Structures are given as structure tokens and as C-alpha cells.
Amino acid sequence: MKKILLAVLSVIVLLVLFVVCAYTMKWTKITNITDGIKDQIIGKKEEKKKETSEEKIRVATTIKAVESLVKAVGKDKVEIEKVVPDGTEIHEFEPKAQDILKLSNAKMFVYNGDELETWADKAVESVKNKNLKVVELAKGLDKLDVKENDILDDDKDDEHKDKEHDHADDDHKKEKKHEDKDEKKEGHHHHHDGKDPHTWLSLKNAKKYVEKIKESLIEVDSKNKEFYGKNAKQVTEEIDKLYNEYSEKFAKSTKKNFVIGHPALAYLANEFGLKQLSVEDVFGEGTPTIAKMKALVEYCKKHNVKGILTESTANKDVINTVSRETGAKVLPVYIMEDPAESLEYVEAMKKNLETIYGNLN
């Protein structure tokens, strides 16, 4: 009887232990699930908090040069919104509703200047964003007057100087005739009037752009002041290094004139004591006359022109014709107007300077 009772008690104890273990395991599982859900909720909150604290500054930009310098200073703290679509001719661009919307959604709008983005003021006025920080980079800079520097006129100037002492009266008549011709020419090419808008193609101006971008970013995002300052210092040092290197090189160069299609490099040329001569006016709106082409070929041979510079995104047909007739190579330069251009500012300017120097020496 005792044995039977002991066996029954043993079974009861085992059942109790089994129930207790099962309950404990179930509670532990429930606790783990609850803790997991709790951790997920807390994790998401922390992640959201982190995202909010590291929210990028949305910056609307126009040309490639502006975009590139903004990225150089802002790096991963900025998000670029291209107001001007890739492949668009900036001189002909007029913003549509979707382009204006990009300004409305931005914290900053950075553009070159009113000589280039003639539509900027009206676009800003129409934007429903009172907190938009507008930065005109070229504002306050000393701007160059547009000079045609037509390649054939340059040759005539040389001849004029050689014969000046023998033909004063004839030269006066030719000069008057030449001025009249220039007036007609300026009437045809309205885009040559006023100030040269290509201010970013000066390394000295680029440093001023960087400073203005840095100060503007700090104004809208003061907590990252040191970050922007460090990046601005780095890109400024890169620009200084490039300027110093080519100042020495061009100072030793005996040739100072280079031939280009569209005369966009006046600021760069002025900075290094060079002169750009354009073939743009030789062609006008199409194929040049036989007389002009002959004069151009003679000029290139006389001055040993080894290459003709042209914008990397330009139509090559016209320049290729000149190259074929003169034997000069077609050499790409980077104007950095089209947002689609791949090279960043310092790299593009380095290639431009390498190309010009190699062409002159």
C-alpha cells in the first residue's frame, strides 16, 4: 500500500514539475517576444531621431560649376536639386512649373549671376517659400566687358601696327570702316553685349564662390559650422595649388594667344596673362565664306596654331571643318555650364589649364 501511495505521489510531483516548467518556458517566450517588440519600437524611434538630426540641406543649383562647388563644401550634408535639366543650354533656359517647384522645396538656391541666369529674380519672386536662402555667387565681383577678339581681327591688328608709320591716312579710313563693321556685327550678336557672365572660370573667383557657399551653409545649418569650414579650406587649398603651378608655367611660356570656338575663357586668360582668339565670328551662323576660311587657314599656319579649343559639349561639326582645313587639332575644354558634365570643378579646371599650356608649348 505504501508503495502504491509513494508511486502516486511521485507521479503528482512530476506532473506539478512539468506544469511549472511548461508555464515558465511559455512566460519566458512571451517575455522575449515582448522585449523584442519593445526593442524594435525603441530602435525605430532612435533611428527616426537620428535621421531627423542628420537631415540633409536641400540645395537648388543651376550650372555644373555651381553644383560642383556646393558639393565640395557641403559633401554628404547637402542634397542637390538641379533646377536646369541635364543637356540644357543655360543661355536659352526658361524655368517651367516643375523647375520652380524645386525652389519651393529647397532650403537654399545657389546660382551664378543675373548675367547668366536672367530668369532667376522672377523665379525667386514666384516661389512660395519665405525661408528660401538665395545666394548669387557672382554678385559684387569685378566683371570683364565682353570682347570679341575675333581671330582675323587680331591678325589685322598686327598688320596695322607694322604699317602704321607709313599709312596713317589709309589706316584711319580702315579703322573707321572696321568700327562700322563691328557695330553691325554687334547688332547681329546680342549675346556679346554687356558683361562676360563666365565668372566661375577664374580660379580667384572660384575661391570667393567657395567662401560665399560656406557662409551660406553655416547660416542655415550652424551646428555643422566646423564641417563646412574644413571642406571649404580643403577645396581652397586645391585651387591655390593649381593657380600657383600654372602661374609659373605660363610666365615662362613665350606664346600667349590660344584659339577657341566660343570665347568663354576670358577670365581664365586674364588671370594668367593670356589672350583667347575666337573663331566663332568667322563662322557666324553657319559655314564661313571661302575668303574667311582662307584667311583663317593662313592665320593658323602663320602663327603655328597647333590646336583649337572647343567646349566639351559643343557641336563639333564647325570646329572639325576648321581643324580639317588648318591641320590644327580639336581640343576639348570644360566650361561647366551643362549640369550633365561629369568632371568636378578643380579637376575640370586642371584639365583646361593642361590643355591650354600644352597647346602653347
Residue ranges, per PLM feature:
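Extracytoplasmic metal-acquisition and chelation regions
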Residues: 4-361
